[in-house]
Amino acid sequence: MMNITRRDAIRSMVTGTMLFPAIVQDLLGAQTANPLAPRAPHFPGKAKRLIFLYMTGGVSHVDTFDPKPGLVKAVNEGKKPQGNFKSYLPGAWEFSPSKATGAEVSSLFPHVSGILDEVALIRSMVAAHNDHFQASQGLHNGSVTVKRPSMGSWVSYGLGTENQNLPSFVVIAPYLPYAGAINWTSDFLPGAHTGTRIAGGAEPVADLNRRTPTAELQQLELGLLDRLNNQHLISRPGDNALAARIKSFEIAYGMQSEMPEVLDLSKETDATLKLYGLERGDNQGFAWQCLIGRRLAERGVRYIELVDSGTTKNWDSHNEIDEMNAMAKNADQSIAALVKDLKSRGMLEDTLVVWATEFGRTPWLEQTHGRGHYNKCFSCWMAGGGIKPGIVYGKTDELGLNVAENPVTVHDFQATILHCLGFDHTKLTFRHAGRDFRLTDVHGNVVNALLA
């Protein structure tokens, strides 16, 4: 068929030439392979999907999941941290043993404390960078130096989706986290594996509703646009941005039929809304994100990331550590509710839930009454599909300065997540620029002690 420009196509539609039947015939012809078709992993993974709870900004380990009474002793004895820092800063919240496992958790997370029997708590995480942008990129993309495909994109590439009317990778983020959309880029992977962002509010998904007078006219318009776009792509092989744009039209069309139902909470019971801390009509906030995350998981979305930014602020507590009160209150109940809800529906056994942050905070005072960035040790946790519940793994020293036992690097963390989903992280690769790339690069070991 001859090359057709967009101008030609529009002119032909207006003047009623014989162009359109030929396009329809082509559209009914051979179909290209679907990059989001369901695919089998390397081995049967215990998890079929992942919900990634991302606490952007850097959560203080010594104020949440890693109690350090040694900080009080250090202050009383007049010990000073190295460098030009004034003093150590003891945790401001009381720690008490979880009724579920006995592991100590601070009063910031009373609800999460109640689900620790489902959780593998890691107290020995180590990140490769001390800056938000690079550390966020490292946690999500496996590299602190250059942009690479995100973990969600790798999972989408490896598993595809179980629902062709929804993206395989969805990010619910009312505000952009550090490193922005790099956290969900597909980079050199096929563009269909880029994360789709939901923001919340009155229009959670931008431009979701059709603007054409009828659905039939929209189908004709999209069919023509798809034909022209694919002709354009043939002349530009390897243009990943164009391929992503083309696939976005297909996904957007499918989302028009299914996403409104996902976002409609009217059929959720009063008991479920109360569990999450929601009121009827709520359409934003982290509780809303968690419930929508569960609904996406039910409908076959493979990778769901929930970015907790609280308000326009985040967990980056340089000046006032007390800001963590509001941040934790915003997230604690809904995080615990999500785990409980998944379990009550029989979904926790094949859904991996991950709670993570890009790094921890300094055990010493910074600025007025806050803590600085600290990548030498911090805490994260996992629950659900493939994870051994009710354990604490790793240990830091008495002041929370360094890992004392069983360090877990970000690449180890990623390798373990991929293992739960059925992947050998060394074999989930993509050929680009003359070599095979993978999420963990040349690093990473599965932490077998975390596995069920």
Language-model features, listed with the residues they occupy:
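Ligand-binding pockets and gating/stacking loops
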Residues: 1-452
